[in-house]
């Protein structure tokens, strides 16, 4: 057993898991106690009522059919299935959270020239205008921006040096929100700068996901950071209680400096993301740096999750800096995506669908996981059947072998429609990027899987006719050169892999 695993087992996380297991066992035991000490007809009636109520709740949920089928299969298990659904199946807001949600909807700052930009875009392209309108309708805090320069980084290590330089130049505030932080060269060099910036009077806020950092940071790490003057908190903190909220992780990657410069993409703050250490071959990731007006949206996204997690209303006007417009072509929409009922629509999925459906020449996609529902599968297939050059790149060396089996399980159906599938031969592709027709692109944290599209808090940047698109296209061209194209002749499942795939696909909405 490694030191990390031992530390995790002996930490509060190990205790929480143990206590949650006890809660589940106690609930299960209560029904056997009911059956033993009360009339048989009463226990049958209670269990029957629970079973019927669970089935009705699942059927009437506003969720994808695949999700319903999975939970219906689980609900068939007597007592245990209903308990699992009650604890993990449906997220409901408390009264306090409903008040917070209303407050969030009122806390927004719009871009002054957004209306004019949309008007001009509508005259130029009604199709693209419709896509923009869709994003702004689903994420009420998103907006359309110009006056922004962008730099695309095809590797985490290329972003790293510029990030350090930007952090050293911070004057007012630094916001950091990441899924994974791990002590090592990358994080320690960032932390050293943050500590110095605090001494200079710069405000530093840090938000990291508690489960994402469960195996990388000590349970009391926030205390250490606060002693340095960094306002650090865990997102959706793990406590010894069974709750569906643990499904909703903060998978975002956001870093904002003075409201003027912002970073996002697939890169977490750990050494494998800059290839300082090797875990699964060469780590292929990407990031985007924004300088200018569009950074307002990243600032707002951070403050929204800060508020969701902390319940503290920040004075948005403090951070609504009139950042200078930077000369740069094209339009940008940094947007957020997340679980219901915080987000009423699946923003990340819908943006991907709209880009795929509007494409006429090509759509290129990289994703570490390919576990998608029927609707998105059909959109990708139909694009290929229309004659669009659709290419999807996934890892050749996986971080999770069982998940790779499910990912590969999607290949044949897509290839049958003419979709080209590639595996990144040098190692693990972790970047989440989509490029369509040299016209628009998305770079962010959103994987092509249920966890990203349904359960997690995510973010990305949609770009239209920006200079970065050429850099993204060059990156895709290089990826295709070093990757292996999958064909029916080169791709075969063994019998036991096929069995695993069939079983795992039943539970795909939970993966």
What is each of the regions a protein language model found here?
Residues 2-38, 116-511:
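Charged, low-complexity intrinsically disordered terminal segments
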């Amino acid at each position: 057993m490694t030191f990390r695993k031992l530390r995790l087992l002996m930490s509060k996380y190990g205790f929480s898991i143990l206590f949650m297991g006890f809660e589940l066992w106690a609930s299960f035991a209560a029904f056997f106690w009911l059956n033993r000490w009360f009339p048989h007809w009463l226990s049958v009636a209670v269990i029957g009522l629970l079973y019927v109520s669970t089935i009705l709740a699942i059927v009437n949920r506003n969720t994808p059919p695949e999700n319903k089928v999975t939970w219906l299969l689980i609900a068939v298990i007597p007592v245990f299935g209903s308990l699992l659904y009650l604890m993990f199946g449906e997220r409901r807001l408390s009264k306090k959270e409903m008040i917070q949600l209303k407050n969030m909807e009122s806390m927004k700052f719009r871009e002054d020239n957004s209306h004019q930009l949309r008007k001009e875009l509508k005259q130029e392209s009604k199709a693209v205008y419709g896509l923009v309108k869709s994003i702004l309708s689903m994420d009420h805090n998103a907006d359309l921006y110009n006056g922004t320069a962008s730099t695309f980084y095809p590797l985490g290590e290329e972003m790293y040096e510029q990030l350090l330089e930007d952090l050293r130049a911070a004057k007012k505030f630094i916001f950091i929100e990441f899924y994974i932080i791990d002590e090592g060269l990358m994080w320690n060099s960032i932390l050293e700068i943050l500590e110095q910036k605090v001494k200079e009077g710069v405000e530093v806020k840090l938000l990291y996901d508690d489960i994402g950092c469960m195996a990388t940071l000590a349970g009391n790490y926030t205390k250490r950071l606060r002693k340095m003057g960094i306002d650090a908190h865990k997102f959706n903190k793990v406590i010894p209680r069974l709750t569906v909220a643990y499904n909703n992780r903060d998978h975002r990657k956001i870093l904002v400096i003075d409201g003027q410069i912002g970073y996002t993409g697939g890169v977490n703050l750990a050494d494998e993301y800059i290839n300082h250490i090797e875990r699964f071959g060469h780590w292929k990731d990407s990031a985007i740096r924004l300088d200018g007006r569009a950074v307002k949206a990243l600032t707002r996204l951070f403050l929204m999750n800060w508020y969701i997690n902390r319940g503290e209303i920040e004075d948005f006007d403090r951070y609504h800096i009139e950042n200078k417009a930077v000369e740069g072509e094209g339009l940008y929409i940094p947007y957020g995506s997340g679980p219901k009922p915080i987000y009423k629509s699946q923003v990340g999925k819908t943006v991907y669908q709209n880009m795929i459906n509007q494409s006429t020449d090509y759509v290129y996609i990289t994703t570490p996981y390919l576990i998608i529902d029927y609707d998105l599968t059909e959109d990708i297939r139909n694009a290929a059947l229309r004659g669009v050059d659709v290419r999807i790149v996934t890892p050749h060396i996986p971080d999770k072998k069982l998940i790779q089996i499910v990912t590969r399980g999607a290949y044949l159906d897509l290839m049958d429609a003419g979709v080209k599938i590639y595996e990144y031969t040098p190692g693990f592709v972790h970047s989440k990027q989509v490029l369509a027709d040299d016209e628009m692109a998305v770079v962010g944290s959103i994987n092509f899987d249920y966890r990203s599209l349904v359960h997690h808090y995510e973010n990305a940047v949609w770009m239209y006719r920006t200079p970065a698109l050429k850099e993204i296209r060059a990156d895709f061209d290089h990826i295709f050169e070093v990757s292996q194209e999958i064909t029916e002749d080169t791709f075969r499942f063994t019998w036991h892999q096929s069995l695993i795939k069939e079983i795992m696909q039943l539970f795909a909405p939970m993966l």
